[in-house]
């Protein structure tokens, strides 16, 4: 028993466990072996808790939200009464959700064509700007999304050409989308996705999808019905 507790004090848990189990099988054991095994389990748990605390703190500082969440969930299972751990877990989950939302706007900037999506993105910028550090990737997302928002309602030239016999319509433009028959016209459109259609009696309808990027550019779309209906 003395050897077992000496090994335990030295942090040699495997050696201590083997000695306590051997003593536990002895008819002379008075319960000390069980106490020794309990202390080993407690010390091992404490070591795990300390490691999880350290690793989760590092993950939070680095803005590695998913890693922090995984570690904090393990830690919460071992320390269910810890209010601090629950608070950190909630923070990491909220910031992961915010980071994912911000990345969604950056991955699909043309979605800001929608007024509703634009307002959500603006709200995201306000909310993230008010967060205390750490912000992780959201710091760079703020800069990138701020630029996109500044361009979201800029208007860029789009030139449409046709044959003067095709009836042209720009979808997503309401009543203003009916352009009639034309040979050449210039539109000013905000960044987004558009569809232009063409109709002509006796000919197959045509349709062209195009995009206006956030930073504009030279866009020329030709739309005309040329294939006769069999």
Regions found by a protein language model. Give the residues of each.
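Short loop/turn and low-complexity linker motifs enriched in small/turn-promoting residues
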Residues: 2-12, 17-28, 35, 42, ...
